[in-house]
Every structure is written in structure tokens, then in C-alpha cells.
Regions:
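Active-site lid/adjacent beta-loop-alpha segment flanking the redox-cofactor pocket in flavoenzymes
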Residues: 260-371
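Helical element adjacent to the flavin cofactor pocket in flavoenzyme catalytic cores
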Residues: 157-212, 216, 220, 224, ...
Length: 444
């Protein structure tokens, strides 16, 4: 078979890889790009709408973000909104809505009020909602099953309307690739059902071996999938553990918008939240749970189990970090409780108790386990720092190849990350990147 050579090959057709294909085609001088995807379509894993909360994480209601991180995330979140507006995707897969972070009890109420004062300059649209205001805009947060006001004091910070809050990242990934293909004078080939087995560098070229026996090579490679860095002997200082998130759905619409709980600083997992679901007619989806699984891909059988153990890269440093983070009684109890959420019948009983912190009146018969919903989020461990690294990770130590790991808010940050990687590729290849055009079209 004749070898097909590209300037850049991107491995992984989720939101991160698809965004990079678009940015390279639209804004760089690179003319020859390929995107390789293991499965039959784009965004079939963590980027599809059923695998995540469909939230634009811009930092306004994410209480685990400090002001510095919120500022950076907001800049990247604005890019995806601008992209959608440019192409007319409003109310197709980008939607406005109500959202808020809820504080329950005296200490959380004070934290929300303090946070509001710190963040209102960065997010001028933010409002503070007391219990009386919440009765009008999100009454299920206030009243219990008897129709009486909940005993705890509550307050929320958020916005009622006029802000984009919700997106179908799977649909967005498909739009990125289609728009990349439409750029005149550029080649953007999409190879589906193309599982990458090995990446080898010979001289200045990278050779890609695939399960379907394509003969591919590239001058520059970006890997947005799998455990390929360890296969190449790179990134040995990093390991990953995989946390799966499941959801419960309500049988009717209970919330008017997104409601996020306060994040426990001890827990490296998302706090419980309720979201009107795009796939379920606006019925509320509660989650995610947190379940450790020995696989990189959920709902795909056991084929990713070997890759999990490669990416775990287990040694005593990893053991110490796991013990430090999961040996704490509060964290351990949290994980045990989340295992319980996966058990039929019992899981619903346990989960309802948690969900009542958001909706005091919710009952077991109001919810059901959302089969097939949820994904897997890699959590990165640094051997040298001996700690869990929250957020995204990038391995770029070897010239000509980049490996990305993009847990939340990776989907929200997809264009910002694509900009970074596109500039790296252009610099390495000696090709121009049109910063002025990108700023004009993608920055607000």
C-alpha cells in the first residue's frame, strides 16, 4: 500500500482533536491534515452529549476554580461561543439558560456571598439570589415534600438569562471537522474505524501503524487519545487513574436551569449538580457519581483495560499518592458511597438522599438510573511531585509530537487548547499562523 503523508496527523476524534483540525485548517498555513478516529464516528466517547453534563464551564459557578483559573477558563469558553455565533449554531447545539451555584447551610451561604463579591467584576452578569428570590425562579430548591420551606438557609449566585450555558459537544465536534473540510485549498482527511497501534519516529518523520493497515506518516503528530506516550517511552513521570461518572434522570422537568453544589476542597471530583438535559426533553439529570474503573473507555467492553494499566504506570510513588488522596476517611467514605450509587435498587435510595440537598422534595420514584450515560475522566498523577494534578495535562517533551489529556473543563477549553497546539505545530514546521484572523473571529 502506498504511504499517505501529512504535515499533521491528529489522533482522536473527540472535541479536542476535532477543534485542532478546524483551527489548523482555518487559521494556519498547514495544508495537509488527517484526523484518525478509532470508532465509527466522531465524539463517540466522552464528548458525546450523554457522556458529560453539556455545560459550558466558564468559571462563574464552578466553586472549585479560583479567580486565576476562572479568568483563563472564561477566555477559552468565550472562544467556543464566538465560534458557534460565527457559524449560526445558536439554538441548534448552543443554548442560553439559567444557572447557579447553590450554598446550603450557614457556612456555604457565607462562602457563596464571599465568592460573589470576588467574582462579580469578572462576570458582571452575576446575581445573588436569596431564598425569597429562589422561590420565584427555582422553587424546587426551597420547598420540601410537604410544601414547607426547607429549614436551612440557602443562597445562590448565578444568572437567569442572556448567557450561553449549554452545548452539545458531540455535535460541535462534528461541525469542527465539516468546517475544516470546507476550507478551500486545504486537505483534511477523516479516517474513521482507524485504531492507532503504534507511533514510531524515524528521522524527522512519524510513522503510524493502524489496525486497519493504513500506511500513514506525518511531520507532526498530536495525540488526543489513549496511552500512546507510555508506549513511546515518553511521559513516564505521569500516571492516570480513571474515574467514571454516572447520572440519574428525573421523569419530568424539575429544575429551570443548571444548579451546581459547592465543591468539597478535599475531593478531586465534580460536586453534584442538576442540569436540564438536551437529550431528555429538559428533564433533570443529576450527577456525576465517581466510580474508579480499570479502563479508559466506558461502554466499550474491556478492550481499553490493557491501556489503563499502561497509563497507570504503577510504582511506589503512585501508591503513595493514591493512599494520600483516597486513604482520607472523608474521601474513602465518598468513594464507597459512590460505589453504592451503581447498585440496582439500593443505588437509587442512596442517591436520592444526596439529591435532596438540591431538591428537598425529590423522591425515589422521581428518578431512574440513566443507562448508557456518563463517561470516564482521567485523573493525572505526577511521580516527581507525588501528588494528584487536577485538570489537564500535556506532554510535549519530544520534538514534533504532543500528547494531551483533557478532563473537565477540556471540552470547554477545546479551542484554546487547539490554538496552543496549532501554534506549536506551526512553529515546529516553520509555517505561518494567522493570529490576527483568529483574534478577530474567535476572541470576544
Amino acid at each position: 500500500m502506498q504511504e499517505k503523508h501529512y504535515e499533521v496527523i491528529i489522533i482522536g476524534g473527540g472535541i479536542t482533536g476535532s477543534a485542532l483540525a478546524y483551527v489548523l485548517a482555518e487559521f494556519s498555513g498547514i495544508k495537509n491534515i488527517a484526523l484518525l478516529e478509532k470508532y465509527e464516528g466522531l465524539a463517540t466517547l466522552n464528548s458525546k452529549a450523554s457522556a458529560n453534563s453539556q455545560t459550558i464551564h466558564c468559571g462563574d459557578i464552578e466553586t472549585n476554580y479560583d479567580l486565576q483559573k476562572a479568568t483563563e477558563v472564561k477566555r477559552k469558553a468565550d472562544m467556543i461561543v464566538k465560534y458557534c455565533q460565527k457559524h449560526g449554531y445558536e439554538n441548534k447545539f448552543l443554548f442560553q439558560g439559567q444557572k447557579m451555584a447553590l450554598g446550603v447551610g450557614e457556612s456555604e451561604v457565607e462562602l457563596i456571598k464571599e465568592r460573589f463579591e470576588k467574582f462579580k467584576e469578572l462576570y458582571p452578569y452575576l446575581q445573588l439570589f436569596d431564598k425569597e428570590e429562589l422561590k420565584k425562579i427555582e422553587p424546587k430548591l426551597v420547598f420540601d415534600g410537604r410544601g414547607e420551606e426547607r429549614a436551612e438557609d440557602i443562597v445562590a449566585m448565578g444568572v437567569q438569562s442572556g448567557v450561553y450555558t449549554t452545548i452539545d459537544y458531540g455535535a460541535m465536534a462534528n461541525s469542527f471537522v465539516q468546517n475544516a473540510k470546507n476550507v478551500e485549498g486545504k486537505t483534511c482527511d477523516l479516517h474513521l474505524n482507524t485504531e492507532v497501534q503504534n507511533i514510531t519516529k524515524v528521522g524527522d518523520k512519524f510513522y503510524i501503524r493502524t489496525a486497519n493497515r493504513l500506511s500513514l506518516s506525518a511531520d507532526f503528530v498530536v495525540v488526543d487519545a489513549g496511552a500512546h506516550s507510555h508506549k513511546m517511552g515518553l511521559g513516564q513521570d505521569l500516571s492516570t487513574i480513571c474515574i467514571a461518572g454516572s447520572f440519574y434522570l428525573t421523569k419530568q422537568k424539575l429544575l429551570n436551569g443548571k444548579v451546581y453544589m459547592m465543591q468539597n476542597p478535599k475531593l478531586p471530583f465534580a460536586a453534584l449538580h442538576g442540569d436540564p438535559d438536551l437529550l431528555a426533553g429538559g428533564c433533570t439529570r443529576f450527577g456525576p457519581t465517581a466510580l474508579t474503573l480499570p479502563k479508559l473507555e466506558r461502554y466499550k467492553g474491556c478492550r481499553s483495560v490493557p491501556e489503563f494499566f499502561q497509563s497507570l504506570n504503577f510504582d511506589m510513588d503512585v501508591a503513595k499518592v493514591i493512599w494520600q488522596n483516597f486513604g482520607d476517611s472523608e474521601v474513602r467514605d465518598f468513594l464507597i458511597r459512590n460505589i453504592g450509587f451503581e447498585i440496582p435498587i439500593l443505588g437509587k435510595k442512596l442517591f436520592v438522599k444526596n439529591a435532596r440537598k438540591i431538591i428537598p422534595s425529590i423522591r425515589e420514584e422521581d428518578i431512574y438510573y440513566a443507562k448508557g450515560f456518563g463517561g470516564v475522566r482521567p485523573q493525572v498523577i505526577s511521580h516527581s511531585q507525588k501528588k494528584l494534578l487536577l485538570g489537564e495535562a500535556r506532554i510535549g517533551e519530544n520534538p514534533g509530537i504532543i500528547f494531551n489529556m483533557t478532563p473537565s473543563p477540556g471540552a470547554t477549553s477545546c479551542l484554546g487548547n487547539a490554538l496552543r497546539d496549532a501554534k506549536s505545530a506551526c512553529e515546529y514546521l516553520g509555517v505561518s499562523f494567522d493570529d490576527a484572523k483568529f483574534d478577530a473571529e474567535m476572541m470576544r
